[in-house]
Structure formats: C-alpha cells, structure tokens
Amino acid sequence: MDNSFDILDIKAREVIDSRGNPTVEVEVLTAGGYGSAIVPSGASTGTHEAVELRDKSQRFGGKGVLVAVDNVNSIIAPELIGFDSRTQREIDTYMIELDRTANKGKLGANAILAVSMAVAKAAASTASLPLYKYIGGCNSYIMPVPMMNVINGGEHAGNALEFQEFMIMPVGADSISEAIRMCAETYHTLKKVIVSKYGKNASNVGDEGGFAPPVSDIRETLDLLTDAVKMAGYEDEITFALDCAASEFYNKDDNKYIVKGAPLSSDQLISLYKEICDEYPVISIEDPLDEEDFEGFASLTKELKGVQIVGDDLFVTNTERLKKGIEMGAGNALLLKVNQIGTLSESIDAANLAFRNGYGVVVSHRSGESEDNTIADISVALNAGQIKTGAPARGERTAKYNQLIRIEEEIGYPKYAGKNIRCPF
C-alpha cells in the first residue's frame, strides 16, 4: 500500500496580499510531497459569495484573519491528518461538513479554500506531476487567451470611471507567449498615449496593474485603447473586453444605474452596451447588470448574440445560481473565482456545468492577489480557453503569466484558444 500521499501535517499562517491586507496561507505536508497556497480577496464582491472570515478587531483595521488561521490549525488540520491527499472531493466535502453552514461562514471560505488548494498541490508534488496535469490529466493542453486589464476604474481605482475594467484580448496571437508579448507592448504604448494626453501623473496604476487616468467617459477610455492598439500594430489581433461590475453603480432604491451622474434604466444601459459594441471591437462584457437581474442578463444575451456575456456577481461560481442562469438564458459564460465558492472541487463542478451547457469559462484572479499562481494551472487543467489576471505588471499578476509561459513550454505542442474563446476545442 502506497502511504506517500497520506497527509502528515497542515499549517496555516497570516500573510499579506497585494493590497497589504491579511490573507491565509496554508502548507500541507504528505509523506512524499509538499504544497502551499495563498487565498486571494476581492474588492467588489457579490452578495452571494462564500464568507471570507475576518477578525473585525483593531489589528489591520479589522481585516485580520487570525480566526481563520486558527480554524485551520485547531479544527481542520487535526481532522485531515492521515487522509489520502488524492481524495480531493472527499477532503473538500469533509471540510464543508465540518463548517455546517451554507456559505462557509463558520470556518471561513478563506480557511477552507487555502487547505483545498494546498492539498491538491501537495498531491501533485507527491505524484511528481505539475498541478495542471494532476488536475486535468493528459488532455489538458489548451492555453487560455488572457484578458488583460489595462485601464482600471470602479472599486479598483481612484478615478471617476463607473466601469471597473477595460481589457485587451489578443485573440489573433498564435501562442500564450506571443499573446503576453502583444499585450505588454500595447500596455507600454498605452502608457505613452495616456502621458501625452493627461500628463505623467496620469500613468499611476490601480489594484490590478492597469492605468487609472483621470477620465470618466467610457468612450474616451475605449478611444485610448484603440489608439494604443493601433500604435502598437495589433489592430487585427487584439479585441476588447469590459468588466462593468454594474452592481457597484446600481441604485436599488430607484432601480437605476448611475453612469456619469445620469440615472439609466436597465433598457437604457442595454442600449448603451449595444452602441459600444457597434463602435468598438468589444467581444466580452462581464457583469453588465445588477447581480440579481437574471431577466436583464437574458435580454442582453439575446440582443448581443455575437458578444460573450459573463456572469461574475451573477453566478459567484455557484452551481445553483448558474443552473438558474442556464435555464433563463442569462449570460453565456461563467467567471470562475475559486474563493467565491471556497473549494477546488466545487469550482471544477461549476466549470463542468458551464461547459456541458455551452457556456464559456473565464478563470479569474481577484483584485487582492499574491504570488500564488494556482489559477494559471487551473485554467490549463480545465481547458478553459480564457484567463483574467490583470495587467502585465505587478508581481502578483505577472506570476500567473510567467507560469503560463512555463506550462506552454512544458506541454510542447499546446493549442492556443485564439478566437474560439468560449469553445476552445
């Protein structure tokens, strides 16, 4: 009997993320390997996300995670010692049962997820396999198209833009390494465009490494992207994507969206999206409406047939909410954030449900990130075809891109998803 996969030790600690806020790191030791994981944290979060447990004490302005760390060390770890690290679903289910809440609010999704990811990495290490191959097997070979957030707004920046992310997608590249190069060159060109129009101080960056120029107009922002792409020479290779995070500028009291100070109805906002997609090469829109507006999402999906409509706050990587969306035709793609649901197994379940119903999958980071590059491996393991992990700047973002370059080199003959983002096969 092979005991090398048996879990010998689990240890959690408090570390800091890219915003200087505390988060949970977990190390798992097996008889034959080792894995560690750091969980991310979001700024604009969906109401239905699993609970990120915070101490709410004076330390770190109430954002400490010592309670979550103690939950790992005192409650979860003693229960999992001796488990076979390959039994990922059994381990994840066991932790969910230990928590006994619908939203992981007792132990904390940040505690549970850190253990879940570290267990997978320890098992992969014990098997002498890269994580993407351990999770996905020999059929994991598709490299995702990056959605690079090069202009930040909303909750991620200090400017007046309502929309949270303006992204570039190099669908015309031939490989992930070429895609990253195209985006990096465009990013540097964009900086020159911004500095020439607004001055050097306008080149400051937001949480995800994108620039945060002093603009408030959506079209003006898209014009900046258009100019940068043209100047970089990639007009035929690079398209645009938006993350509107509409729940953040939705006024529930009067059922209006506040855009540049003007109240817009759902229908008026949908008309704005149609105009933008006619005027610019926008191929993907994330969270265009409020997180509870399944009907509005369904209407927009019908109106913009050639555009990917991504549910983030709408679905929160939750299979029950995704099932509702599928039944109603709300959106046609899932944004997969592992910390929204809290375990690796449940994240994979959500991705598989999306794939089975013709939905695309975008594996995503959070605005509060770390050097952990697990999501790069997950994107390849699932053959997702798309990854969203910020600008080609800041170490917590480039860690994921550099891991994708390594994976591409290791696979040898990968397929780059390119224009087939929702169905990369």
From Swiss-Prot:
Keywords: Cytoplasm, Glycolysis, Lyase, Magnesium, Metal-binding, Secreted. Its cofactor is Mg(2+). The keyword Ribosomal protein does not apply. Pathway: Carbohydrate degradation; glycolysis; pyruvate from D-glyceraldehyde 3-phosphate: step 4/5. It holds the Pfam family Enolase_C. GO terms for molecular function: magnesium ion binding; phosphopyruvate hydratase activity. Binds a second Mg(2+) ion via substrate during catalysis. Gene3D superfamilies: Enolase-like C-terminal domain (3.20.20.120), Enolase-like, N-terminal domain (3.30.390.10). InterPro entries: Enolase, Enolase-like_C_sf, Enolase-like_N, Enolase_C, Enolase_CS, Enolase_N. It catalyses: (2R)-2-phosphoglycerate = phosphoenolpyruvate + H2O. (2R)-2-phosphoglycerate binds at Q164, K337, R366, S367, K388. The active site is at E208, K337. Catalyzes the reversible conversion of 2-phosphoglycerate (2-PG) into phosphoenolpyruvate (PEP). It is essential for the degradation of carbohydrates via glycolysis. Belongs to the enolase family. This is Enolase. The lineage of its organism: Archaea, Methanobacteriati, Methanobacteriota, Methanomada group, Methanococci.
